[in-house]
Structure formats: structure tokens, C-alpha cells
């Protein structure tokens, strides 16, 4: 984590009087979440001078998509007015771009491998086209694109080039232009199913995933943060599961940081304990704990809790 960029991010948040929480696990290795921003539209933040890894992006995507929020990667590699879309609900911005996001300014340019595009509000496009009496063919001809392209624009399946955006503004006005981050999140359907292809019989986490999936629960596996799994039942109740590791002090730190993540994501934290010493300490601290040889109790807790959470 870059101290210079992290200080910029914190200064921006404190200037706007946002409340936030630092996630300090793992302490000395790469991690996927540095800051949890508590706001109307809560956000996960990863600060990096280096290129973020696939594992970091994967964690950010899973948490963001499962909670219908945003993950922001703040890095000096990005331009001020352009967002890079890294994955569903994961966006990379410069420190200047982050300040615009926090100030509520619209960022409408984004970059993918296919080029630079402008975010449009598909529902406004369709409404204005129908209100003004234009057919899909009329708009396609005016823009110089196919009818299929207009269908894709109106369904939200495709955004537009700068050239097409200018013509759309001429035709329908600039309120047709959207915000890359918040309009993208609102348009995403929640996805929590994941194929766990790597199964190691020696790994307790792999065995746990297998048992949870066998009992009809939806699982997302995390690698570089304090929670090990996101679990959802059929009633959409959400849990974060954290597994004790070999080091006592690191485990206590892990549980504390996982509690912050659970609070942010409005999830229930469930801790799996592997030693008797840790079991007593965690119970004294009020954590909901399960022993590693009693996973059925954890499954019964999750499957029996339908309707308890909002």
C-alpha cells in the first residue's frame, strides 16, 4: 500500500467528513481491501502504486457484486477523467478521479481493452426516443450505427464511442450521459454463484467449501482479506466465514478485521476454530464460533436462520 496515495485518499475522505475503516489484515502481505468507506453507497477501496493482481481484483469483485456496491482501486496509473473497468463493480481511478467520485461529480469516460467509451443511461435513451416519436431505425440512421446497436444501447448491454455520444447529446440532451461507477452498479444483477474447481483433500477450506455447496449454499471464496468465504442461503441471508490459522496473534487480528468487513457488508460473522484455547477466547469476546470438526452445526445455523436477517 502506497503511503503517499493512502494519505491522499484519507485527506479526501476527511475533508468531506466521510467515516471509514482501515482493514489491516493481512499485515505484511498483499491484500485486496485497504479501506471500507461507510456512506450511503458504501465502497471498498484498494490503494496501490503497483499493478493490482488478479487475486486482488477477484476478491474486490466478489465482495462488491455480492453486496451490490463498488470497489475502487486508487492508483497513479489512471488518468484524471477516465475510469478503468477491471471487473464487474471494480473500477480503477486516479487520486484526482477518486476525489471527483467522493465529491459526487459524474465520471462518464471509461477504458476497457476495447478502447474508450462513454457511459449512457439506457432507460433515459429509450424514454426520450419514444417520447419524441423516433423509431429505432430513425435513431440508428442518425447515429450511423445498426438497429441492433440501438437495441443494445437501450438494454444497457453496450455503451457508446465519443463520436456517437456527441450525436446522442445533439438529439436527446446531455442528461442521457451516465456515471460509469454508480450507474453500472445499479444496473448489475447480483451474482453469487461460483464454480470451485480447485479441490484439495488436504485443505480444510476446500473441504468446507465442498460441504457447504453440497448443502445447497452459495459460496464465494476470498484469498487476500480477513474473511475466507462469503456464504448465502436461499433466502439471501449473507455470512462471512473466517477460519483460524496457525498463528494465534494473526488469527485474533484476522477475526477483528473480519468483524469490520461483516459490519460493512451487513453480514453475520461466523468463525471456525481449530484449537481449544482459541475457542474459549473467542467465546469470551462474543464471537459466534464453530469447531472445525462440527461443521454440521455451522450448516444448521445458516440453513435454519431464514428470515432472521434483513
Swiss-Prot record:
Keyword Transcription regulation: yes
Signal peptide: none
Record's keyword terms, sorted: DNA-binding, Transcription, Transcription regulation
Keyword Protein transport attached: no
GO molecular function: DNA binding; DNA-binding transcription factor activity
Top-rank taxon: Archaea
Domain HTH cro/C1-type: 125-180
InterPro entries tied to this protein: Arc_TR_HTH, Cro/C1-type_HTH, Lambda_DNA-bd_dom_sf
Residue ranges flagged as DNA-binding region: 136-155
Matches recorded under Gene3D superfamilies: lambda repressor-like DNA-binding domains (1.10.260.40)
Listed name of the protein: Putative HTH-type transcriptional regulatory protein LS215_1371
Organism listed in the record: Saccharolobus islandicus (strain L.S.2.15 / Lassen #1) (Sulfolobus islandicus)
Taxonomic lineage: Archaea, Thermoproteota, Thermoprotei, Sulfolobales, Sulfolobaceae
Amino acid at each position: 500500500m502506497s503511503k503517499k496515495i493512502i494519505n491522499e485518499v484519507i485527506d479526501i475522505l476527511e475533508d468531506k467528513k466521510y467515516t471509514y475503516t482501515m482493514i489491516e489484515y493481512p499485515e505484511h502481505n498483499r491484500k485486496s481491501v485497504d479501506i471500507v468507506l461507510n456512506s450511503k453507497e458504501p465502497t471498498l477501496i484498494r490503494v496501490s502504486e503497483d499493478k493490482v493482481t488478479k487475486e486482488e481484483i477477484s476478491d474486490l469483485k466478489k465482495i462488491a457484486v455480492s453486496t451490490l456496491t463498488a470497489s475502487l482501486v486508487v492508483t497513479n496509473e489512471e488518468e484524471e477523467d477516465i475510469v478503468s473497468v477491471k471487473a464487474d463493480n471494480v473500477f480503477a481511478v486516479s487520486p484526482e478521479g477518486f476525489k471527483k467520485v467522493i465529491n459526487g461529480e459524474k465520471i462518464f469516460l471509461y477504458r476497457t481493452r476495447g478502447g474508450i467509451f462513454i457511459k449512457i443511461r439506457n432507460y433515459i435513451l429509450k424514454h426520450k426516443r419514444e417520447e419524441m416519436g423516433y423509431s429505432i431505425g430513425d435513431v440508428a440512421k442518425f447515429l450511423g450505427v445498426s438497429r441492433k446497436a440501438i437495441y443494445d444501447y437501450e438494454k444497457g448491454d453496450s455503451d457508446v464511442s465519443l463520436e456517437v455520444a456527441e450525436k446522442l447529446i445533439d438529439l436527446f440532451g446531455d442528461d442521457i450521459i451516465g456515471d460509469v461507477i454508480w450507474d453500472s452498479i445499479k444496473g448489475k444483477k447480483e451474482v453469487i454463484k461460483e464454480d470451485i474447481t480447485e479441490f484439495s483433500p488436504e485443505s480444510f477450506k476446500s473441504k468446507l467449501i465442498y460441504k457447504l455447496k453440497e448443502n445447497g449454499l452459495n459460496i464465494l471464496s476470498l484469498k487476500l482479506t480477513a474473511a475466507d468465504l462469503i456464504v448465502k442461503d436461499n433466502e439471501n441471508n449473507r455470512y462471512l466465514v473466517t477460519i483460524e490459522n496457525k498463528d494465534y496473534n494473526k488469527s485474533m487480528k484476522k477475526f477483528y478485521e473480519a468483524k469490520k468487513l461483516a459490519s460493512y457488508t451487513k453480514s453475520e460473522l461466523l468463525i471456525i476454530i481449530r484449537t481449544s484455547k482459541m475457542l474459549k477466547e473467542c467465546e469470551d469476546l462474543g464471537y459466534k464460533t464453530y469447531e472445525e470438526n462440527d461443521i454440521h452445526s455451522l450448516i444448521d445455523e445458516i440453513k435454519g436462520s431464514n428470515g432472521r436477517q434483513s
